[in-house]
Structures are given as C-alpha cells and as structure tokens.
Amino acid sequence: MKKILMAASLAVGLAACTSMPTDTAGAGTVKKADMDRLVAVLPAAAQGSFTEFLAQAARENPLLRASVAAYAAKQPLAGDDLVNISRLLGLYNRLHNQAAVIDATAKMVAIPTVRADKVPPHEDKNIIAFGALVEGMARDFGLVYRNVDNRIFEVKLPGSSSEEFGILTHADVVPVVADEWVLDDGTRLDPFKLTRVGGNLYGRGSIDDKGSIAAVLYAMKAVKESGLPLSRTIRLMIETTEETGGDAMKYYRAKTALPEYNIVLDSKYPAVVAEKGSGALRASFALGPAAGAGATAITAMAGAASTNAVPQTATARLQGGNTADVAARLNAAKAAFVEKYKPQGGPFSIDVTQDGAAVQVKVTGASAHGSRPEEGVNPLPRLALFLKESGVALAPNGYAQAVRYLTDLYGTDYLGRTLGLAYADDFMGPLTMSPNLVREKDGQVDVLVNVRMPRGSTPEALSQATSARIKAWGTQAGVAVEVDHQQGNWMARDPKGAWLSTLLNTFGDTTGLEAKPVPTAGSTTAKLMPNAINFGPAMPGKKYTAHNAKEFKEVVDLDADMQMFTEMLVRIGNLSQMQ
C-alpha cells in the first residue's frame, strides 16, 4: 500500500509536466543555491525513500520535473537528466545517511591502524579488524568484497560492462602524541574515539582517510539502492600502508590489474593533478659518553610522532650541573626569545620547569601536515634555537650536535634557503624541508626532516645535494654526521576530457567555488596508479588537519563529500568515454 501511495504522490507531483519531452539535455541543472534551498525544505522527505524525496524535490523546483519524470519512467538518463538525478541522489544520501556515516567513521577511528614496529601491517590485528569492518559493511550494502591478503580491501559495485574505474583511499593512520590532544578550553580528547565538538569531528583518521572511506561506502550503497544503472564497475581499493610508503599497493599491483582511470580521495578539492615528491632526510650523531661531573647535558629530546607531521610540542630534558641556575637562566631568557621569533612564523610558547635533578623545556607551537609547514609553527627548531641562544653551556653529546645542526642549517626556515637548496616551480610551489622528529636509536641521535620536492629537480640530484651540504657543514663544524636521504619523485599529469571536467563541474556546482585543477604538496598513492587524480577531501581555503594533533573533519565538509562522491560515482560510472 505504501508503494502505491508513493507512486500516486509522484504522479501527482509530475502531472504538470507529463507532456514535456524526456530528452531534456538543454533544460539545465540545479546548482548550489537550488540545492541549498532543497536541503532547507526537504530534511523530513529524506527520511523516506529516494522516490518520495524526488517527488518532493520536483514539487519544490520545476527545473527538476522532467528529470524526475524520466527517472520514474525508468528511461535511460543522459545529459542534464543524469546530472540532476545524480545530484539529487547525492543530496538524499547526505540527508538520509549523515548519522550513519558519522557512526561508521567512529567505528573506523576506534581501530588504531598505526603501523607497528615489530608486526608487518598485513599481520597486524588492527588492520585485520579494519578489513572485517569493511567486509561487514559491504555485505550489508549488497556490494562485492575481496580481501587481497590484508594489503588491500576491495569493494565493488558492478556495472553492466567489464570496464572499471577505481576509487582509492587508505585505512592506515599516522601515530599520535596523546598529550597534545587537548582543546583550548582544556578538554582532553582520545585520539581514537571520534568526538564531536560543535561542528567538528575529532579523531585520528577523521579526515585522513577514514571519513572518506565511510562516505564513499555509503555513496556506493545509495547508488545501488537507487536502481540507477552503471556502465562501469566501481572498484573501491582501501590501502593499508599509504602513510609508510605504499608497500601494500605495490603488492596489489603485482597481483591485480589496475583500472585504467582512478580517483583518489586523499588530498584536496577541486582536482589534484600534480604532487610533490615526499622524502625523509636523516642526519645522525653519535650519542657519546655521559657528561662529566658538573656539566649540563641534554639527555632527551622529542618532536613529532612521525616524520610527516609538524609537531605541536617539542621537549628537551637537561641534567647535570646546577639545575636551579639552568632553570633560572632559561626562564629569564624565554620572554625575549619568544618576542624575537614570533614574527618568523607565528606565536609559540616556552615552559621551563625544574623536576628534581632535571630541567624540562617544552616549546609549544602549532601542528600541521608535514607537506604544509607554512600552516604550522614548528616547535622543534625553535627549541634548538632557544637552547643555543640561552647561553647555557651544554656538554657536547649527540643531542648538542643535533641542536647545532638544527640551528645552523634550518632555524625557522623550511624552504631550504639556509642549506642553499631553495627552488620553486610556478605551479607546484617551493621545495620544503621541515625538521619534525628527533629520536634516540641504536646509540645515535637522529634528526628526521620531511622533504617535499616539486618539479625542477630529481630525487637523485636533490639527495646528492643535501648529503653534500650536510657533510660539508659537519666537516666545517667538526661534527661527525651520518646522512641518509630517501627521496620520492614528484608527479605532474595533464588529464583532459570528460572525467576531469565531470569532477570539476561536480565540485563547482556543489560548492559555488572556483573549480580548476590544482597541485598539492602532499604525496599520495596516486603516483602508483595509472591516470589517477585526487578528488578531496580537504576544502580550499581551510587548514588541512591530517597528521595534526587534534585532527578533525568538519561535519559540513563530510556532508559535501557524501553529496559529491555520490554524484561522481553515477556520472563517471556512465560516461560514454573518459577522455
């Protein structure tokens, strides 16, 4: 009975347009303002079926009546009809499934898929648990699931032909420093518990990349349940090692033919066609013997939890000598130091405390993604500068040498200028070199720098240049230094044709923002895929919180993802040709 009433309602709503032609390619499509009005008046309608939602939408906006009539008559959709129906399906998915997507994201965030030191990812219980979660969702949604040896979790929505297009995301996340997950009002967050505060969803992986996984799975569900035909199969591939080199994708490529065209959900909108190459530069110093009696030495330092994140805090522990005097000198110096360096990148703070026989120094800056040091205030080089300029004499161990290295070759510069390596590409932007991590390992003190290389050099040339420059510094300074620079290459593609224009049109009409291809300083597994470009999830003009302390996803942006992913699947799934 409900279905009969629903059909009758749809027929009444469309009565005025039954004589209109079904080929409405020139009739126009709804844009942001139209969709905003529908969202404002149709939230209740979205709690029913998609067919009921369409009937209400057609009553609200006459522009939609012909497209809705064509869908109701199960006619083949093309042109503006296909755009309008895919756009309405995106709206419906956003309104109908928002709570479910947030809940799914919470379940994913609760699985700490950080790479372990002693267990390979494909044997890690958390990666295996994540695959089981995705498998359950795929089964519930009527999708086809395949586990490729716990490296790639694959979900397919079959189309009518053998042709596929790929969607790529990743399940692994970067490590956290739990003490840094504290909001400005003092609220302490659990990084692995999705927490909504106002319009933000806090949690490791909320934006990178678990929110995208939940959103695209529900987009696939919405497309399947709508009954809209697809000429291409949609293949979702969920990577498990993206943050640590992409070994899983390399394994997958050796065993599975990749789709010819691929869309990655791991960067930013509107459409990313160029990526810098990501590199890790390590300088190592022998820890050396313990300091002699009466000498003050740095006995510990810490920065970020991973090389590809600008830290929120950096700390040093000083021991030996007159610790009360050391603490007093540092406290006396900190105010002037902050004022001196605040104009060079932004505000930061310094805390100095005496803890028994040790002095603890903590510099608090602003965390950022390692590819975007300009969005943060890196506390690690500022800590090194503070220790050097305070006038406190430090025993010449590996930590003191690391401090000298940081101050002599970096300071507050992250563009390679002090190293004499700076260059930039007009489209991709400048080389960046951000010192983010200090660790003690195997009798050495390591300083790790996240390098992002644009077009204009090669991995071999840049690695040779950095090694030569650092070794020359070591010789001049009388410091023994071991250098290792592993550098990935940049990617620049020039995609043309229908698939790119479809992505740009979807983004522009949904957001009202400028839609053109853009570069990113980030590096994703798009480099490992044929014809791959990124589509989201970060919005233009907003700080990208991936890899940050207090990583979050805005609910309004998650809504946009749900809406645009759904439209994208339908439209690209039915393109007559991709180019």
Predicted regions and their residues:
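Positively charged n-region of N-terminal signal peptides that target proteins for export
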Residues: 1-4
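C-terminal motif of bacterial Sec signal peptides marking the signal peptidase cleavage site
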Residues: 14-16
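Acidic/His- and Gly-rich active-site-bordering loop/insert found
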Residues: 20-201, 230
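An extended, acidic, His-containing surface patch that forms the Zn2+-binding/catalytic region
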Residues: 20-35, 364-448, 452-468, 473-579
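Alpha-helical metal-binding/catalytic segments enriched in His/Glu/Asp
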Residues: 167, 195-244, 282-289, 314-324, ...
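Acidic-glycine-rich active-site phosphate/pyrophosphate-binding loop
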Residues: 179-196, 285-287, 292, 353-363, ...
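Acidic/histidine-rich catalytic neighborhood of metal-dependent amide-processing enzymes
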Residues: 209-288, 331, 335, 413-427
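Short, conserved charged micro-motifs
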Residues: 291-293, 322-330, 372, 456-464
